[in-house]
Amino acid sequence: MRVLYIIAYDITDARRLGQIRYFLKGYSTGGQKSVYECFLEREELKFIISKIKRLINPNEDRVHIFRIDGRSKVITLGIAVPPIDPEYFYIG
């Protein structure tokens, strides 16, 4: 079962920043700059955590992963759209 996670990061090095941004875009259904909405299976989450641990410098970088309860009401403002778990993902 897919669960919605918000992954936010603050990476100090431009090279590492690019690597993490490129990696997370493959799993995200939405987001903006350094915050991504990702619907993940448990194994995908484990893989993402292990990959990010290898990419970051733990003394300089910061990554937060928030599990969003599906029963919670989503409030959107402005042109924001509520996150939707897509039926299919395109990888290519």
Swiss-Prot record:
This is CRISPR-associated endoribonuclease Cas2 1. GO terms for molecular function: metal ion binding; RNA endonuclease activity. Mg(2+) binds at D10. SUPFAM superfamilies: TTP0101/SSO1404-like. Keywords: Antiviral defense, Endonuclease, Hydrolase, Magnesium, Metal-binding, Nuclease. InterPro entries: CRISPR_associated_Cas2, Virulence_VapD/CRISPR_Cas2. It is an enzyme of class 3 (hydrolase). CRISPR (clustered regularly interspaced short palindromic repeat), is an adaptive immune system that provides protection against mobile genetic elements (viruses, transposable elements and conjugative plasmids). CRISPR clusters contain sequences complementary to antecedent mobile elements and target invading nucleic acids. CRISPR clusters are transcribed and processed into CRISPR RNA (crRNA). Functions as a ssRNA-specific endoribonuclease. Involved in the integration of spacer DNA into the CRISPR cassette. Its cofactor is Mg(2+). The gene is cas2-1. Its EC number is 3.1.-.-. It holds the Pfam family CRISPR_Cas2.
